[in-house]
Amino acid sequence: MVVTTSDVVMCQMRHSDVQGVYRVYGSWMAENFQDQVSISNQIMSKFAPSMPHAVRSDVINNRLHNLYLHAHYFLICRHQLITHLNPHLHRN
C-alpha cells in the first residue's frame, strides 16, 4: 500500500478524511498539491470507476413501477387498519 504525505498528516492531526487535510494545509504546500492529487487519484482508481455507470431507462421504469406498487399496497393496508380499528367507519 502506498502511503501519501496527506495520509500521514491526516493520521497525525486526527482529521477524519484527506479532504480536510487539503482544505486546511493545501495553501501551505501548494507546490506539492498536484502530486498528492495524482497519487490519491491513482490509489482511488483501484477501488472505484472514474465515471458512474449508465442505468438503462427500463431498469429505472421497473423500479419506479415497483415503488408505485409498494406505495399502493401500503395505502390499502393503512386503510384496512384504520377501518378495523375504527368500527364506526364501516359502512353497510
Swiss-Prot record:
GO terms for biological process: DNA integration; DNA recombination; establishment of integrated proviral latency; symbiont entry into host cell; viral genome integration into host DNA. The keyword Signal does not apply. Keywords: DNA integration, DNA recombination, Viral genome integration, Virus entry into host cell. It comes from the Bacteria. Belongs to the 'phage' integrase family. This is Putative lambdoid prophage defective integrase. It comes from Escherichia coli O157:H7. The gene is intG.
